[in-house]
Amino acid sequence: MSSNTVNQRVNFASTKNPLEYPDFLEVQLKSFQDFLQLDTPPEKRKKEGLYKVFAENFPIADTRNNFVLEFLDYYIDPPRYTIDDCIERGLTYSVPLKAKLKLYCTDPDHEDFDTVIQDVFLGPIPYMTDKATFVINGAERVVVSQLHRSPGVFFGQSVHANGTKLYSARIIPFKGSWIEFATDINNVMYAYIDRKKKLPVTTLLRAIGFENDKDILEIFNLAEDVKVNKTNLKKVVGRKLAARVLKTWIEDFVDEDTGEVVSIERNEVIIDRETVIEPEHIDEIIDSGVQNILIHKEEPNQSDYSIIYNTLQKDPSNSEKEAVLYIYRQLRNADPADDASAREVINNLFFSEKRYDLGDVGRYRINKKLNLTTDMDVRVLTKEDIIEIIKYLIELINSKADVDDIDHLSNRRVRTVGEQLSNQFAVGLARMSRTIRERMNVRDNEVFTPIDLINAKTISSVINSFFGTNALSQFMDQTNPLAEITHKRRMSALGPGGLSRERAGFEVRDVHYTHYGRLCPIETPEGPNIGLISSLCVFAKINDLGFIETPYRKVDNGKVDLSENGLVYLTAEEEEAKIIAQGNAPLNDDGTFIRNKVKSRQDADYPVVEPSEVELMDVAPQQIASIAASLIPFLEHDDANRALMGSNMMRQAVPLLRSEAPIVGTGIERQLVRDSRTQIAAEGDGVIDFVDATTIRILYDRTEDEEFVSFEPALKEYRIPKFRKTNQNMTIDLRPTCNKGDRVTKGQILTEGYSTENGELALGKNLLVAYMPWKGYNYEDAIVLNERVVREDLLTSVHVEEYSLEVRETKRGMEELTSDIPNVSEEATKDLDENGIVRVGARIQPGDILIGKITPKGESDPSPEEKLLRAIFGDKAGDVKDASLKASPSLKGVIIDKKLFSRVIKNRSSKLADKALLPKIDDEFESKVADLKRILVKKLMVLTEGKVSQGVKDYLGAEVIAKGSKFSASDFDSLDFTAIQLSDWTNDDHANGMIRDLILNFIKKYKELDAELKRKKFAITIGDELPAGIIQMAKVYIAKKRKIGVGDKMAGRHGNKGIVSRVVRQEDMPFLEDGTPVDIVLNPLGVPSRMNIGQIFEAVLGRAGKNLGVKFATPIFDGATLDDLNEWTDKAGLPRYCKTYLCDGGTGERFDQPATVGVTYMLKLGHMVEDKMHARSIGPYSLITQQPLGGKAQFGGQRFGEMEVWALEGFGASHILQEILTIKSDDVVGRSKAYEAIVKGEPMPQPGIPESLNVLLHELRGLGLSINLE
């Protein structure tokens, strides 16, 4: 054990040179960056992501090729609203996507048409926040990565009912038709196109250019050619024919419709294949006029190729033309118009780049599998691919090759956010290109521009439906930072193009040896999704092809390379057959193994080998697990099933009022908080200039160069979130942990709160636990709690709920927010402001008015009395009804915030006033931009002083500052810096870098000013942006403080969960001999059968840590041993294993046996009794059965089911039973009569017929049975 204190923790890790964890959100952030490639200049962009989609869809031309629309570049402008604004107003955080398009005419007749270059708005793109989320309609969402079958070729095997082994090869492309080659029980090989159309493989070979039998047999080297003459033929008597002997002739006939003479080639089979040549065949062969015949080779081939001969026997075609026609008829069930169209259909299937795409991955996998050297740019199938696949399949039949394991991670790849968005954009752009083509054709003779051709809604509708409805776009789990980060690193096999729960078998769900270091074997949901949803391991990365890689250290001749160069990231395929040592294998300082036998891993085997045989070594013992599993101390002592529950339950831990980091951690807690980005962190080195509860200001250090190229001040302000609601109605309430004048370093965490303490993850509380039964109250995992825990708010959490009310214009008039509500007492509206919204600080009880609203009633003819009153008083107060938002039956809390958003509805005079304001805003913007440009020009003059231009060009490549000329202020004044190439302006590299940064910073600042201008104009002309049809929206936020109580669920980190059964007074709890009462009593019987001994290790080490004031880090599979525990309990003056005598709180007597008393980290989970408790007296009924609805959400009742009826029957309680089944449930008439009887105090009426019986009768009548009750 090393006694070094990392982050004030004693670390037990034995591994030397541990690898730094990668950024945990890299999988999401990098994918989105690669999708947009915003930091890459247009000319250097890779053909991937959005750029690839544009490149594939452009240029677009009309049908006559007169007009061409070309794509030059795309860019984005700053968002109109901040992320916080979007969350508050229910908007989508998006950026405008714009493309530079060029429209030109190729037709010389259109002389009046000039080439047009325009920036065209293509719609808003939801933009990923720095926390790797998307804000869609005010809610934070995550796009989960999908694990799906990699494109490529897969060889499989199945067994027919009669025991015959059948083999198949399936080619899966990114885009295009699937093709499968498969054998049948008659040893014939067929090709299946799109799993439907079946044809002999030789027919396909003919169609792709191997026209006759000779060509096909030569591929497999199966036949020899014999020249036809008597001498040669006599020599081959007794041998088998490999190909048919065909007589070919041309036949002419007259087409009746056209009168033309048409020639057709005819074939006649003289002798069939597989015929043994007899002497009498010689003359027939010579008479047929063939030049050569094919016969079987005498020496047998290494493999059995009889399947090819069998397939040829089944082949109905004799030439390429016949094969093409046959395939066309199979696919289309019709005859082709001509030979060319038939051939085109086959080419389009597999050889057309527009219709078929293997993708980089598919080509890579096919080349790898079949040992081909085809260029990676060839993304369609080739003849060579098809031949090699057939050859491999024949080897498979001859047991000379192996079938693929489809659960091997080399056959599964990850579709990350960027790829999923690219696919959606491809769909949107393909639709848009169709409409562009149509519009070009319609506007043939007009002068038009790119803007006239494009409809921006096309793309945004596809993108919006993806984020709103796709199974992989999910509402973010925001219970605590761990839940957030785990959700973003999740891998799902479900979703479009993936598996479905029902079809997924055991093999797909099971742990595979290739998951090691890539997908966590522990963290997966319990239930129907088990094994289909996994989590990425801590060190895993996803490469450009979408395969998951994990790091290893190279080992050469028994010596581990501990340098940076010795680190390699390998995919499952590259790791295949390598011998890999474990991460905790003891090493000498020079990297050699201490022991002469090393435990290692090779595929699914675990050999013990000599150090010289080892090829690689794990980088760390925790490499195998995900973040959540890595947070469980002593995981190595827990059963896997319980560890699974533990890692899942930590994600449900509710943020507490005061967070407390665990005494026994694993060392990953700090990294998790840093990478979750839920706290405020310093962006660089600097000094705290100002700090209070809501704001932190930092003055950052900047070099002279950074200062020179920047247009921003070095002082940056951060707002600290206070009582912000999360997706799960938890609270983000942060507090600063820094003081004015403190020096901060880059990445330093400056706040705490929201399950974080001192920069470390803090999900629960360290509590003193006794493992002993207590009066039966901890039977079956129940938990006994000390009242102190409740009183001192140790496990108290704050929950914030948002309630909103919308004001719309109805058919009968405008709704209105007001505190003046008809027929409501003054007492009920005392807390409402003039807009009818409850005041901040008001205590809410069930039934209280939160937001007052009146809505117009339907006009009905007034009675004479009403007419008289209206004539006298002239009021129309009776025309509105109360439509206020009231607190639900279980709602109690305090109003902590309120908001009102209004769309501006203006009269003529205020519109005129606004019109006068707009020019002022424009002038203000112009003056700010002029000042900004003045500063830019001044700085550019300094940078270019004495230097000569290397030629400055605009984005079209036209020179705007001539090569060889000197730079002048007038040159710079006339430049449009937003449309300029930033390549080398001078021959000084340093100056060029400075110029580039300066102009980029200028463009960024300019776009910010432009966005601010648009925002101001929008606020004046339209007001708050609200969803369609809504005029006002009021929101109130209610905070509820929840103490822990009986019925709440708690858990440790080892899957040891339970429900609080009793909160006991402090003086009645068992206490230690020094008088300390324990906080919590757990049942010791919950440990042995569950096999999660890790909790005992944790309790023992935790108590030693608490007594000594020390915190520990015990990494998984490399943590503290029993000897370490004993050493620390001895230091703390505690008995071994913390077996301590306790005294009974009631009598003060000592218990007979010592019990384990330790300090365990306990979590309060999101399953709280307050959310689940529910009672109904009257409420809604189901429309059809007329029975009460079920569930708390519907304000439903409990179902009195079949078994409960038996119970009442057993007691003979016939009247109660009759009541329950009729008037208390679905006897509609009886219900209302019973109500009348109760009100009037009369005896109960006789029950009628239950509605469910009527439903049954209607059902039977619907089946045509006439049933009447008598």
Swiss-Prot record:
Enzyme class: transferase
SUPFAM superfamilies for the chain: beta and beta-prime subunits of DNA dependent RNA-polymerase
A single Gene Ontology CC term: DNA-directed RNA polymerase complex
Family annotation (InterPro entries): DNA-dir_RNA_pol_bsu_ext_1_sf, DNA-dir_RNA_pol_bsu_external_1, DNA-dir_RNA_pol_su2, DNA-dir_RNAP_su2_dom, DNA-dir_RNAP_su2_hyb_sf, RNA_pol_bsu_bac, RNA_pol_bsu_CS, RNA_pol_bsu_protrusion
GO molecular function, one term: ribonucleoside binding
Xref: PROSITE patterns: RNA_POL_BETA
Family: Belongs to the RNA polymerase beta chain family.
Subunit structure: The RNAP catalytic core consists of 2 alpha, 1 beta, 1 beta' and 1 omega subunit. When a sigma factor is associated with the core the holoenzyme is formed, which can initiate transcription.
Protein name as catalogued: DNA-directed RNA polymerase subunit beta
Organism: Bacteroides fragilis (strain ATCC 25285 / DSM 2151 / CCUG 4856 / JCM 11019 / LMG 10263 / NCTC 9343 / Onslow / VPI 2553 / EN-2)
Lineage start: Bacteria, Pseudomonadati, Bacteroidota, Bacteroidia, Bacteroidales
